Amino acid sequence: MDGIIPVVEKKDFLRWFLKEFTLKKRECSWLLNYLMSDDDLMENVHFVEEAERCPKALIMSTNDVHTVPFCFHKYQQVTMDAEKAFHDIRMNPEEAIYIQLHFSGAKHNPNYIAVLEDNPYVPENEDLIAKQKKLAEAFLERSVQSFEEKELLRRIDEALDARDKETFLTLSQQLQHLRQHSD
């Protein structure tokens, strides 16, 4: 599910898909055929999951699933009008187009999986990222505390060497306070 998918593979997949499935909106077939007619456009086509998170996305469904027939996302704008999507693609051929197809068995279909790419706009695993962030924060907190403790111990040693009882007592209290609040 990553790497660059050759245009030939994308076109072969779309030919197979259009032969095997009927899209809920016939304009979607026209749109996919239009994309296949231009290799430069196909270079910018990426099949992904969670396409709605992408800056420019086409989401299409076949008759055998219970999802929205067609949706075009462009930044925060959403439309169900395939003609608007066609016009946008024609006017902005250099922009990446992320396509998500809803059809029966999509998640296990080897033809679809072969052209499916990682969605760069979706964190790999949001839960994992949150856990890693917490671990990093805890590590940073322990590191700062360890540094502060070592610095206090160094300054306590200096106070002892200088026979500075007042500074020694103040720093000892700070060290004790730091250790109590670290548990």
Curated annotation (Swiss-Prot):
Protein name, UniProt field: UPF0302 protein BH1670
Entry-linked Pfam families: IDEAL, UPF0302
Family: Belongs to the UPF0302 family.
Organism field: Halalkalibacterium halodurans (strain ATCC BAA-125 / DSM 18197 / FERM 7344 / JCM 9153 / C-125)
InterPro entries named among the record's database cross-references: IDEAL_dom (IPR014957), UPF0302 (IPR011188), UPF0302_N (IPR014963), UPF0302_N_sf (IPR038091), Virus_scaffolding_prot_C (IPR027393)
